[in-house]
Amino acid sequence: MAEIPRIVLPHGGYRKLTVYDKSETIYQATVLFCRRFLPAHGDRTVDQMTQAARSCKQNIAEGSAASGTSKETEIKLTNVARATLDELEEDYLDRLKAEGLAPWPMADRRAMAAKRYGREHADWAYWKPIFESRPKDVFCNLMITLINQTKKLLDGMIARQEEDFKKFGGVRERMHAARTAARGESWDKGIYSCLDGATTLADLNARADEIRRKISSAVYSIKRRK
């Protein structure tokens, strides 16, 4: 007997994801950057940067929560999280330009060391003492490295979500599949119950004839509706 498909898929668990840990670190570091290097009042960049950083982690969380009923919503929210990191990266690049500096080249030993550290550590607890002590230019470059690592993780997540959508479809499709399977299961149970009640071969044949008549009647009704 076929298993009835689930309507609400497993969801949540975003706090166990490395990409969420990195997004939390990016948010906390951005708040610290604004506190250390930007004026407390009168600079709209402070709100823009903190909101972009917060939006990333919030959309990851909301997408994870929505994935049980809507894979489409999950994909959209994860894409929003990815887009906000592009915006935030531009803010850090602008800060470097304002200081007359450029981002570290990919082959720069500092960039390579930052990438290694970022691959090994995602939690804010590991990054906090580093960001509290580094000058503005190093801070910006470290953030650019972290942001790019997180964007790559989000790209992989979006690709997996797209495959899940192809496999499981939307909630309406799953509801239809579940209803269809449930009707089939109910029909199967009715047939088996009817046949199991037979006590003789003649009785079994009579019950089978009755089932065939019901099937023919159902087919006729369907054709008339068409």
PLM region spans:
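Amphipathic alpha-helical assembly/interaction segments
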Residues: 1-226
